[in-house]
Amino acid sequence: ARKARIKEMMAEVLLPTDDEYLERYPHQLSGGQQQRVGLAMAFACRPSVIVLDEPTTGLDVSTQEHVLKTIRQLTRDHGVAALYITHDLAVIADLADDVAVMYSGRVVEQGEVSEIFKNPAHTETRHLVAAAPDIASKKSIVGLAGRAQSPGKRPVGCAFA
């Protein structure tokens, strides 16, 4: 039953299910294959919520799209809610319904993705949106000035006030 479940999950993330492939070590897999094995492991437990911390970091654009498509399909097929932790606004715009923007360990703005990106209310959100590359426009990318606050030296209240 265990081996059958492993093969079932590997097939769901579009990886080979033959015994030779299942015997491979992580270093014998590409980054995208490693991500999909991680997804198979996570969904094998039949969770109601899955936390994805930077699920596409270090992947090329085509592999990134394939991994995100796989995540989208798995969450729909299994009725699983997904919590994405990412700095990649393109991922959020593509996959999320709602977003919470954090700064220095605190949620500074939250709401529907379309509204937050169209009308960002908080300074940090405006900075993030302005810093995101936009292939459709010719605007220059705006860098984020400064450094993140150290956890033990966070200001009281809003750092932007």
Question: Could you describe each region identified by the protein language model?
Answer:
Residues I92-D94:
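A short, surface-exposed alpha-helical micro-motif characterized by mixed small hydrophobic
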Residues A44-S48:
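A short, proline-enriched helix->beta-strand linker immediately N-terminal to the Walker B motif
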Residues K3-E20, V129-A130:
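Conserved ABC ATPase "signature" region
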Residues Y25-L29, Q33:
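Conserved ABC ATPase signature
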Residues D19-E20, E112-A161:
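Short catalytic/signature loops enriched in Gly
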Residues D98, Q110:
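Short, glycine/charged-rich "phosphate-handling" switch motifs in NTP-dependent
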